[in-house]
Design a protein with these regions (language model features):
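Short strand-turn motif at the edge of the Rossmann-like AdoMet-binding core
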Residues: 151, 176-178, 188-193
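A short SAM/SAH-binding and catalytic strip from SAM-dependent methyltransferases
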Residues: 145-164, 188
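Residue-level signal for inorganic ion chemistry
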Residues: 39, 94, 190, 227
C-alpha cells in the first residue's frame, strides 16, 4: 500500500502518463501519483535529478522510463538488472508497470540508493532489490535483461551487461509491433547522434525512435537501443 501524500499538481502531471497508458490498477495509479512529491522532497535534500526537471518529472523521467514498457512486454518472473539506476530510473517506473517482474537496481553511489530504497518502501513496491555495487562487480547472478538510462557509452554497458545475461528465452514486443520476439539482452535509453558510439561498441543494436511512440518535443532524438545476448 502506498502511504505517501499525493499533491494536486502530481495528479495533474499524471495526465501525460495516462495519455499513453490506461490499464492501471488503483495501486499502480497511487504509486505513480506518489512519486512526484517524494522525489520533490528528497531532491531538496540530495541532488537526485536536475532541480529544473522536478516540475516535469512525469515526462522527462517517468514517461521516458516507460518508453521501454511501450516497446517490450516482460512476462511475470522475468529478472531485470538496472545498471547505474541513479535515482531509480528506469527501474522504479518499470517495477510499478510490471509488478510481476523482479528488478535489481545497482549503483556505485550509496546516497542515491538510499533515496531509491526509501521511495520503494514508501510506495509499497515489493519487486525491487537494491545493491550498492558497480555493475561490473556483480557476481553469481544472472538476469534476463539489463536496462539503463544515460549511464555510460554503449561499449561499456555491453561489456558490463553481457556476462550477467541468461541464455535466450523469448519475450514479445509490445504495442508497436505485436508479433516479433526478443531474446534476453541489453535495453538502454540514449539520445543524440549515436552513430560513432554504436560503431565503437562492436554491437549491432536495434534502434527504436521514442518520438514514434511519444511525439512530445522532449523525445526528439531520443532512442531505445536493444542489443540481444
Amino acid at each position: 500500500m502506498c502511504h505517501s501524500r499525493v499533491l494536486p499538481y502530481a495528479i495533474g502531471q499524471m495526465e501525460i502518463i495516462l495519455k499513453y497508458f490506461t490499464e492501471f490498477t488503483d495501486q499502480q495509479l497511487n504509486q505513480f501519483k506518489a512519486l512526484e512529491p517524494l522525489y520533490r522532497e528528497w531532491n531538496s535534500k540530495i541532488n537526485i535529478i536536475s532541480r529544473k526537471d522536478v516540475d516535469s518529472l512525469y515526462e522527462k523521467h517517468i514517461l521516458h522510463s516507460l518508453s521501454i514498457a511501450a516497446a517490450f512486454e516482460f512476462v511475470d518472473g522475468t529478472e531485470i538488472i538496472d545498471i547505474g539506476t541513479g535515482g531509480g530510473f528506469p527501474g522504479i517506473p518499470l517495477a510499478i508497470f510490471f509488478p510481476g517482474v523482479n528488478f535489481h537496481l545497482v549503483d556505485s553511489i550509496a546516497k542515491k540508493l538510499k533515496v531509491v530504497e526509501a521511495i520503494t518502501k514508501d510506495i509499497g513496491l515489493k519487486n525491487i532489490t537494491v545493491q550498492h555495487i558497480r555493475a561490473e562487480e556483480v557476481k553469481n547472478r544472472k538476469f534476463d535483461f539489463a536496462v539503463s538510462r544515460a549511464v555510460a557509452p554503449l561499449k561499456d554497458l555491453w561489456k558490463w551487461a553481457k556476462p550477467l545475461l541468461e541464455n535466450p528465452i523469448p519475450i514479445t514486443i509490445g504495442t508497436q509491433k505485436p508479433n516479433p520476439q526478443f531474446s534476453p539482452g541489453l535495453i538502454c535509453l540514449k539520445g543524440g547522434d549515436l552513430a560513432q558510439e554504436i560503431s565503437e561498441s562492436g554491437t549491432r543494436p536495434r534502434v527504436m525512435e521514442i518520438s514514434e511512440i511519444f511525439p512530445e518535443e522532449f523525445f526528439r532524438e531520443k532512442y531505445i537501443l536493444y542489443v540481444p545476448r
